[in-house]
Amino acid sequence: MPASRPTVFREPTFARGDSPMAQYDVFPNPSHSAADGVPYVVVIQSDLLDALSTRLTMPLAKLDAAIKVPTALCPGIVVKGKRLHALAHYAAPLPAKNLRRAVDNVSAQASVLESAMDAVMSRV
């Protein structure tokens, strides 16, 4: 039986155009047709999964103040000084190559995003 070779850790490789991005980085919405109402998306995927070609994102929407939203699912998030609502129930993977340049990082607001995902998964 041949001797096994030791496992060697290798840095993740990224598809052309992909790059590592931090959890809670905020990017312009790559869907130009939806960008008026949903100007940004936030990466909620763990940095441990950077080698994947997609990123789990949560849309950040402009909502009229008169519209009542369930705050457990749609918490308010401040991005570049503007209040938006995270739409946890619309979280979806996007190709990493479509997320070009981060405009903000909302890691200081991570707990409300995590609570919103928890509400989607276990409290709705």
Regions found by a protein language model. Name each.
Residues P20-M21, A34, A110:
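Onset of an N-terminal alpha helix
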Residues I77-V124:
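C-terminal terminal-subdomain/extension
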Residues P2-P20:
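Mixed-charge, Lys/Arg-rich low-complexity intrinsically disordered regions
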Residues V26, A34-G76:
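Compact nucleic-acid interaction/catalytic patches
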